[in-house]
Structure formats: C-alpha cells, structure tokens
From Swiss-Prot:
Record's comment describing the protein's domains: The N-terminus and transmembrane domains are required for self-oligomerization and proper virion budding, whereas the cytoplasmic domain is required for CD4 degradation. The cytoplasmic domain is composed of 2 amphipathic alpha helix that form a U-shape.
Name of the featured protein: Protein Vpu
Disulfide partners: none
Subunit description: Homopentamer. Interacts with host CD4 and BRTC; these interactions induce proteasomal degradation of CD4. Interacts with host BST2; this interaction leads to the degradation of host BST2. Interacts with host FBXW11. Interacts with host AP1M1; this interaction plays a role in the mistrafficking and subsequent degradation of host BST2. Interacts with host RANBP2; this interaction allows Vpu to down-regulate host BLM sumoylation.
Residue stretches of biased makeup (Basic and acidic residues): 26-37
Family, as annotated: Belongs to the HIV-1 VPU protein family.
Molecular functions per Gene Ontology: CD4 receptor binding; monoatomic cation channel activity
Segments of this protein annotated with the region Disordered: 1-37
One cellular component term from this protein's GO annotations in UniProt: host cell membrane
Taxonomy of the source species: Viruses, Riboviria, Pararnavirae, Artverviricota, Revtraviricetes
Pfam families in the record: Vpu
InterPro entries given in the database record: Vpu (IPR008187), Vpu_cyt_dom_sf (IPR009032)
Key words of the record: AIDS, Apoptosis, Host membrane, Host-virus interaction, Ion channel, Ion transport, Membrane, Phosphoprotein, Transmembrane, Transport
C-alpha cells in the first residue's frame, strides 16, 4: 500500500496524516498509526 510505504519512510510528508484522516473516516484505523504515536 502507498500509505504504508510512506509511513515506513518515516512520515516524510504531512500528506500522510491527511491520508490517515481519510482512512479513519472510512473506518479503517491503521494499527501502525497507534504504534507511531
């Protein structure tokens, strides 16, 4: 997945957060998001 790749890169862009918001909005909370926090 593109978002996973971006996260693996180390949160290079703020756009990742935006994508995350979209995922959460859809109801797909990514587990790696919590781990990153």
């Amino acid at each position: 997945n593109q978002s996973e790749r971006a996260e693996d890169s180390g949160n290079e862009s703020d756009g990742d957060k935006d994508e995350l918001s979209t995922l959460v909005e859809m109801g797909h909370h990514a587990p790696w998001d919590i781990d990153d926090m």
